[in-house]
């Protein structure tokens, strides 16, 4: 869904784009592949995803970013199992060589490994991928990657724990892939609450102090405002008690979820009988009321159940894809909002 422009030190112009599991580099002068890049003009996007990934689905739904002589990419992978890992990778934009990898599902001894109760979970889990795109602070050399959930989307009995670095904004040194900071927006996601857009960067004024900031919008209708240098919240982000009494075998949900104290949610946070379209027929209304009365809908983080759970806003809700546009002059952020209920 996009291309990445690159100009080498000789002022030659190229574009990168992905088709299937291949990242191509094309010479803009003649439209031909750059044969010196990777394998005669492309690199296999399975590279850097670990053992046994070659047969798994992987592509890119958003273009990569250029930093110096690197093309840095996220990926789109399966939302069920088996799924490839969502590692963030940087390739040499000239040769196609793999330069660095950040593992979004930590392995033994790596930070975040302890966020999975099963010590072998990393061997079989996939996902935690940055499908929505990446953001670069070129001046500071910081890459920001918004990740989605670990697969499966709606059951986490095989991945008990908070599941780092899924559902997180991850700040990386763009030159070497080393983590600078992270902030997790959903613990142990079983609601498909992937971060749906790249964060936007802007200077935010608070009490006459200018803060280099980052705004990350979510499917749930929240905006997380963070200092983009150190990842600290600009306003308090509270750990709110949420329903955690899952009846699914093996499932252990987080007892709290992070909720920004400011700004208020930009999407409605509940769907009641009164929200049914007033223009539907009486028969349709009765049918909808029957469905709503039979499913779980106590909270935006209601535990998934075998009988059904209301997800509102839905799997493609909040600010999915549309993203945000900052107005630093007026200290405002503009965003779209999708309000669609799913079961």
Where are these regions (language model features)?
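Repeat-blade elements of multi-bladed beta-propeller folds
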Residues: 1-22, 56-82, 123-152, 158, ...
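Glycine-rich, aromatic-lined ligand/substrate-binding cores of catalytic
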Residues: 195, 295-343
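Extracytoplasmic/lumenal domain signature
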Residues: 9-11, 23-55, 87-124, 156-195, ...
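Glycine-centered flexibility motif
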Residues: 2, 20, 38-41, 74, ...
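Short, surface-exposed beta-strand-loop junctions and turns on beta-sheet-rich folds
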Residues: 32, 80, 151-152, 232, ...
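N-terminal leader/propeptide and maturation segments of large enzyme subunits in energy/redox metabolism
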Residues: 262-291
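Peripheral, non-catalytic segments that deliver or gate enzyme domains
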Residues: 213, 221, 239-245, 315-319, ...
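Short acidic (Asp/Glu) and glycine-rich catalytic loops that position anionic groups and cofactors
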Residues: 149-150, 268, 303-304
């Amino acid at each position: 869904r996009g291309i990445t422009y690159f100009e080498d030190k000789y002022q030659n112009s190229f574009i990168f784009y992905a088709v299937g599991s291949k990242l191509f580099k094309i010479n803009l002068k003649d439209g031909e592949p750059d044969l010196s890049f990777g394998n005669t003009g492309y690199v296999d996007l399975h590279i850097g995803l670990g053992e046994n990934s070659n047969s798994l689905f992987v592509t890119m739904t958003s273009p990569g970013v250029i930093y110096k002589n690197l093309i840095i990419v996220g990926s789109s992978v399966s939302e069920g199992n088996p799924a490839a890992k969502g590692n963030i990778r940087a390739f040499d934009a000239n040769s196609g060589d793999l330069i660095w990898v950040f593992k979004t599902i930590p392995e033994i001894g790596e930070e975040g490994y302890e966020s999975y109760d099963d010590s072998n979970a990393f061997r079989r889990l996939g996902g935690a991928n940055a499908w929505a795109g990446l953001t670069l602070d070129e001046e500071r050399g910081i890459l920001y990657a918004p990740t989605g959930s670990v697969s499966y989307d709606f059951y986490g009995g095989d991945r008990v724990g908070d599941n780092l670095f899924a559902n997180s904004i991850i700040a990386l040194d763009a030159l070497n892939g080393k983590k600078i900071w992270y902030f997790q927006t959903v613990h142990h996601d079983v609601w498909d609450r992937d971060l749906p857009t790249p964060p936007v960067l802007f200077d935010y004024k608070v009490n006459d102090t200018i803060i280099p900031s980052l705004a990350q919008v979510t499917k749930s209708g929240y905006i997380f405002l963070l200092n983009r240098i150190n990842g600290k919240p600009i306003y308090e982000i509270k750990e709110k008690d949420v329903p955690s009494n899952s009846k699914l075998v093996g499932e252990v949900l987080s007892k709290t979820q992070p909720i920004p104290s400011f700004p208020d949610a930009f999407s409605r946070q509940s769907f009641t009988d009164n929200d049914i379209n007033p223009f539907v027929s009486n028969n349709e209304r009765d049918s909808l009321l029957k469905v709503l009365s039979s499913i779980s809908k106590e909270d935006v983080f209601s535990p998934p159940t075998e009988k059904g759970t209301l997800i509102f806003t839905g799997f493609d809700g909040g600010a999915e894809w549309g993203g945000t546009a900052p107005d630093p002059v007026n200290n405002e952020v503009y965003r779209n909002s999708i309000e669609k209920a799913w079961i």
